[in-house]
């Protein structure tokens, strides 16, 4: 009689609450079996499992912060250079577009493209918006907020992406 040895309850996947990479923003990277079948992955390959906390930290999901003084967007775009990125402000929205043509990588040829659109708060000073790309591929879009009653100046314009040589100081969630 064969008896299946199960992992302790605290090492098993958490079912629908287990973070999957399926909707992460790893533009063009491959999917693994646990991305598509998180319930079965521990039974198919019980000795290989990505850490729950590492998955959450490396998820690549953009983060938007809006506090009293400023508005900031952090977006992981590690596969793109500043020349591949376009950041535009149109009315109350910021649009971030990244595209690079087909290039060769370790497994063949790949091309990537993404679009993100975020609503700007009405009190963000659009004349002082800035955008930078850190050495580790974190795009930071930020703008100061103005006191209520002051015109924030809404117009359509492109925001240049500057390159920083130091790694990002973005939150690690």
From Swiss-Prot:
One GO cellular component, as annotated: cytoplasm
Annotated region Disordered: where?
Answer: 144-173
Q: What subunit structure does UniProt give? A: Heteromer composed of three CRYAA and one CRYAB subunits. Inter-subunit bridging via zinc ions enhances stability, which is crucial as there is no protein turn over in the lens. Can also form homodimers and homotetramers (dimers of dimers) which serve as the building blocks of homooligomers. Within homooligomers, the zinc-binding motif is created from residues of 3 different molecules. His-100 and Glu-102 from one molecule are ligands of the zinc ion, and His-107 and His-154 residues from additional molecules complete the site with tetrahedral coordination geometry.
State where Zn(2+) 1 binds. Answer: 100, 102
Q: Where on this chain does Zn(2+) 2 bind? A: 107
PTM field: Acetylation at Lys-70 may increase chaperone activity.
Q: Which GO terms describe its biological process?
A: actin filament organization; apoptotic process involved in morphogenesis; embryonic camera-type eye morphogenesis; lens fiber cell morphogenesis; microtubule-based process; mitochondrion organization; negative regulation of apoptotic process; negative regulation of gene expression
Q: What does this protein do?
A: Contributes to the transparency and refractive index of the lens. Acts as a chaperone, preventing aggregation of various proteins under a wide range of stress conditions. Required for the correct formation of lens intermediate filaments as part of a complex composed of BFSP1, BFSP2 and CRYAA.
Predominant place of localization: cytoplasm
The sHSP domain, residue ranges = 52-162
Provide the gene name from the record: CRYAA
Q: Which organism is it from?
A: Ovis aries (Sheep)
The protein's name in its UniProt record: Alpha-crystallin A chain
Question: Its Gene Ontology molecular function terms?
Answer: identical protein binding; metal ion binding; structural constituent of eye lens; unfolded protein binding
> Which residues, renumbered to this chain, carry the PTM Deamidated glutamine?
6, 50, 90
Q: Which residues carry this modification: Phosphoserine?
A: 45, 122
Q: State where composition is biased (Basic and acidic residues).
A: 153-167
Q: Which PROSITE patterns match?
A: SHSP
């Amino acid at each position: 009689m064969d008896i299946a040895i199960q992992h302790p309850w605290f090492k098993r996947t958490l079912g629908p609450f287990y973070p999957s990479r399926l909707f992460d923003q790893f533009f063009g990277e491959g999917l693994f079996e646990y991305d598509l079948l998180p319930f079965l992955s521990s039974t198919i390959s019980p000795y290989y499992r990505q850490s729950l906390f590492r998955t959450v930290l490396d998820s690549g999901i953009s983060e938007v912060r809006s506090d009293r003084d400023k508005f900031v967007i952090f977006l992981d775009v590690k596969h793109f250079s500043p020349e591949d990125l376009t950041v535009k402000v149109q009315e109350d929205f910021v649009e971030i577009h990244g595209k690079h043509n087909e290039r060769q990588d370790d497994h063949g040829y790949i091309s990537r493209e993404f679009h993100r659109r975020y609503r700007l708060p009405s009190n963000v000073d659009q004349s002082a918006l800035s955008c930078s790309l850190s050495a580790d591929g974190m795009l930071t879009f930020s703008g100061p907020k103005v006191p209520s009653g002051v015109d924030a100046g809404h117009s359509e314009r492109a925001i240049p992406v500057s390159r920083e040589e130091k790694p990002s100081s973005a939150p690690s969630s």
